[in-house]
A protein has these predicted regions:
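Positively charged, low-complexity terminal tracts
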Residues: 1-110
Length: 110
């Protein structure tokens, strides 16, 4: 998979997967699930690049760093293993790696 496909998979997983409850979705993502679904369905095209960037960043960050406890179904939604997804996220952010600590998670929230 190329990076764009991994991003698409992560957006779809965040929206359609069992990783995030409706009650905490807006708090975690800064979007309603319906908005993130529209961004995911239109990937990579979206009329607001800042909104799209926030959606991608928060999808990656929450899938990798939030304690969703659903690693058992990760591969039902996302093909690469989490360490490869983290490398894609780092490249997308223009970084060489990600700080895996809780502080790193909170620093990456948008």
């Amino acid at each position: 998979e190329d990076d764009s496909d991994v991003i698409r998979q992560c957006l779809r997983a965040a929206v359609d997967g069992p990783f995030f409850s409706d009650s905490e979705f807006h708090t975690l993502f800064g979007f309603e699930r319906t908005t993130l679904r529209r961004i995911a369905e239109s990937w990579p095209v979206w009329d607001d690049p800042v909104e799209q960037s926030d959606a991608v960043s928060n999808s990656f960050n929450n899938l990798l760093g939030y304690p969703h406890g659903r690693w058992d179904v990760w591969h039902d939604y996302i093909t690469p293993i989490s360490s490869e997804v983290a490398r894609v996220f780092a490249r997308w952010r223009g970084e060489t790696g990600l700080n895996p600590s809780g502080e790193g998670y909170f620093n990456r929230l948008r």
